[in-house]
């Protein structure tokens, strides 16, 4: 344990500023308090850049996901079980931008935690809750897309509003109960008492997680990931087969006679493709962080602080990516944004506006 503590502390001493950017001599987070954490502040230039980059991510996550939620909840055309899942996912990303990223920005740039011990624990709970809630939502969305693509005509009777509500409830309750229970019972610190003692200082917010719980955390990420990869592989095969069938039929009939089933299948495949990109973005953003967590827990916290900070912020930035993906691939979302931004959403009967091209 002593070696593990030494390894961790030596890793923490190689701060992001010392590795990447020149910084002034170390200072204390609280100059007039005994037991204050040490900080190595950035010079003004890099400090301003980091605040701009991290702050932009937080603003984009809040505003972008607020637009997604407003669009889906306001416009009646978007009131579907699948879209309610998307809105709930946007809510998780919105809360990351509101309750996690702004405070992490200050911690990452200043090297200190100025928001109290109570919110330090809440901050960590929010971080875990919203991450797992996102991956559970994406897992259910992938299953929804599989049903829609494999049999689009009976899909409305299988994935109903009730089923969507149960998926949303499960995603939120399990994530919140797990994250808060783990951190508030102190189970994550079992066997790491010496490390926790070494980390404790005024102005710090380091949450230690032992090997057992790091492994469980990784499984909670890995299992839904494998489910999504399997489901989207099947969706890809079905979509490929449907495209081949449509191509064969097009040689025998004119495009004008395209069946209703084919049109529905084409629309569902496009939706599956867009949401598949969102899933891929989530996995690419969070997988490096979880792999690093496993490596750190079993090799004595060897990751330099600047590497950890980079991985954390790549993961955080995922919360800002989905609105950009929707805006790029969904014409209806671009139209909804225009109506919201211009204030036309406040007009009477705006909720029945047609968002889909003829």
UniProtKB/Swiss-Prot annotation:
Known glycosylation sites: 34, 210
InterPro entries: GPCR_Rhodpsn, GPCR_Rhodpsn_7TM, TAAR, TAAR_fam
Primary location recorded for the protein, binned into one broad class: membrane
Subcellular location: Cell membrane
Positions in the Extracellular compartment: 1-47, 105-121, 188-212, 296-309
Keywords: Cell membrane, Disulfide bond, G-protein coupled receptor, Glycoprotein, Membrane, Receptor, Transducer, Transmembrane, Transmembrane helix
UniProt GO molecular function: trace-amine receptor activity
Superkingdom, taxonomy of origin: Eukaryota
Transmembrane segments: 48-68, 84-104, 122-143, 167-187, 213-233, 275-295, 310-333
GO cellular component assignments: plasma membrane
Entries under Pfam families matching the protein: 7tm_1 (PF00001)
GO BP annotations, alphabetical order: G protein-coupled receptor signaling pathway
Disulfide bond residue pairs: 37-201, 120-205
Family the UniProt entry places it in: Belongs to the G-protein coupled receptor 1 family.
Function: Olfactory receptor specific for N,N-dimethylalkylamines trace amines. Trace amine compounds are enriched in animal body fluids and act on trace amine-associated receptors (TAARs) to elicit both intraspecific and interspecific innate behaviors. Ligand-binding causes a conformation change that triggers signaling via G(s)-class of G alpha proteins (GNAL or GNAS).
Name under which the protein is recorded: Trace amine-associated receptor 7a
Provenance organism: Rattus norvegicus
Lineage of origin: Eukaryota, Metazoa, Chordata, Craniata, Vertebrata
Gene name, Swiss-Prot/TrEMBL: Taar7a
